[in-house]
């Protein structure tokens, strides 16, 4: 499946059109349209000023930016951009740090990755086929 264009509309004239910051990057950087402060252990919904029109075969997944997490303890609450939505994308940021986090208008706060959607029929069964992995997980293969 190839999708060459995804439409976006500016709801706020200060909104910045997202772009990938490096060749081969999967995520498009999303900017805030406002400045703000998030206290330690606080959260805030941050406006982007953009509404998206994604095709039926695609969903946009919002992820955090590794630098914000590493340096500022900022986490992004996962958000999806679904086909047919026409409202502003609002991103919730969580401050897991000990300091107030301040951001400015046009700050890159998250990244948006577009992925294809696979539609499946869900089949309720009494049991599942056994696999080699079975019920293992949660570190069962070790660290090295």
UniProtKB/Swiss-Prot annotation:
Reaction equations catalysed: dUTP + H2O = dUMP + diphosphate + H(+)
Binding site for dUMP: 66, 133, 138-139
Domain of life: Eukaryota
Source organism of the structure: Encephalitozoon cuniculi (strain GB-M1) (Microsporidian parasite)
Listed CDD domains: trimeric_dUTPase (cd07557)
Gene3D superfamilies for this protein: 2.70.40.10
Key words of the record: Hydrolase, Magnesium, Metal-binding, Nucleotide metabolism
Full protein name: Deoxyuridine 5'-triphosphate nucleotidohydrolase
């Amino acid at each position: 499946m190839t999708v060459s264009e995804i439409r976006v509309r500016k709801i706020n004239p200060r909104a910045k059109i997202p772009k990938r910051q490096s060749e081969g990057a999967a995520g498009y950087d999303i900017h805030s349209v406002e400045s703000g402060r998030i206290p330690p252990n606080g959260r805030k919904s941050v406006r982007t000023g953009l509404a998206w029109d994604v095709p039926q075969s695609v969903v946009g997944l919002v992820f955090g930016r590794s630098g914000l997490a590493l340096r500022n303890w900022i986490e992004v609450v996962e958000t999806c951009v679904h086909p047919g939505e026409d409202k502003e994308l609002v991103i919730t940021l969580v401050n897991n740090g000990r300091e107030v986090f301040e951001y400015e208008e046009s700050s890159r706060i998250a990244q948006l990755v577009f992925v294809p959607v696979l539609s499946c029929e869900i089949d309720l069964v009494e049991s599942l086929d056994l696999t080699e992995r079975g019920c293992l997980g949660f570190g069962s293969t070790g660290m090295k």
